[in-house]
Amino acid sequence: MDGNHSGGLGLVGDIGGTNARFALVEFDGQDPRLIEPTAYRGEDYGTAEDAIEEYLRKVGVKHPDQAVVAVAGPIDHGQVHMTNLDWRISEDGLRRAGGFRNAKLINDFTAQALAAPRVGPKDLRQIGELPTSGEGDLAILGPGTGFGVAGLVRRHGQEIPLATEGGHVAFAPVDDVEIEVLRALTRRLDGGRVSVERILSGPGMEDLHVDLAAAEGRGVEALTAKQITERAVEGCADSLATVNRFCAILGSTAGDIALTLGARGGVFIAGGIAPRIIDILEKSPFRERFDSKGRLSGFTRSIPTHVILHPHTALIGAAVALTPEGRAAVS
């Protein structure tokens, strides 16, 4: 791809703990357009390079000029060992596998942050009474296989993403039920530390389902996160209680992150779980818990919250990172 992207194709990727998604990207002016976005199960491939080679064969493109791949995990000197998938990925390895002139790894929620201001109203669901704001810094967070967190600093017309590992901060219970959940998770981890990701994720929802019942002195059928969310939507009492508690904890955590990042411009919830439970989330204690910050409740009450419904937000953000402005922001 040349400097203004005319006539060329790039490759973008979004590799999480469960799925690896890829697309070709071309630019219409400064706006990226995704071509043939495709998802693969990570467990079906030995390496990320294998999945990329399969995708390039599928679309019949040999050597896109540049690539940006968003990954779930901390990147160190152009390398990452995935947090929830046993893949080691390097920029050098990507360049060799795809024949790219340049290849860049970015955090998956850095990509979400770059994309958030570009998501249109039809792909957003407002949670609470406040509409989106065109000003102020943003927080982007969300549960999926893990729990991702990023910020977006907006200054003087520039947007600078802030990569974090905020999903691994300690879980802070707010009532007796959540204290019992914390105790149960601590025992399950042999006395280990309980991060918010241990609850606000697909695997975390499965543990929460069991631990909430145990807190009431009873057992419950062990279910997958997919089963819990589906049954909750259908009205199953136990599953609905789990999802409501999940949403409440998500609200508390999102409010804490908004305070930490000073996200006056809004909080965006991304990831695979929130869109599946969106109607429950709207009616849940999410916003009440988000606002409930003691002496700083006035601060959080002024912050809008939205769920991102677009299925390829991280790919859009990776495409933004191919632009000159995006490259500068993630360099």
Curated annotation (Swiss-Prot):
<protein>
    <recommendedName>
        <fullName>Glucokinase</fullName>
        <ecNumber>2.7.1.2</ecNumber>
    </recommendedName>
</protein>
<dbReference type="GO" id="GO:0004340">
    <property type="term" value="F:glucokinase activity"/>
</dbReference>
<dbReference type="Pfam" id="PF02685">
    <property type="entry name" value="Glucokinase"/>
</dbReference>
<keyword id="KW-0324">Glycolysis</keyword>
<comment type="similarity">
    <text>Belongs to the bacterial glucokinase family.</text>
</comment>
<keyword id="KW-0547">Nucleotide-binding</keyword>
<keyword id="KW-0808">Transferase</keyword>
<dbReference type="GO" id="GO:0006096">
    <property type="term" value="P:glycolytic process"/>
</dbReference>
<keyword id="KW-0963">Cytoplasm</keyword>
<feature type="binding site">
    <location>
        <begin position="13"/>
        <end position="18"/>
    </location>
    <ligand>
        <name>ATP</name>
    </ligand>
</feature>
<dbReference type="GO" id="GO:0005829">
    <property type="term" value="C:cytosol"/>
</dbReference>
<dbReference type="GO" id="GO:0005524">
    <property type="term" value="F:ATP binding"/>
</dbReference>
<keyword id="KW-0418">Kinase</keyword>
<dbReference type="GO" id="GO:0005536">
    <property type="term" value="F:D-glucose binding"/>
</dbReference>
<dbReference type="InterPro" id="IPR003836">
    <property type="entry name" value="Glucokinase"/>
</dbReference>
<dbReference type="InterPro" id="IPR043129">
    <property type="entry name" value="ATPase_NBD"/>
</dbReference>
<dbReference type="InterPro" id="IPR050201">
    <property type="entry name" value="Bacterial_glucokinase"/>
</dbReference>
<keyword id="KW-0067">ATP-binding</keyword>
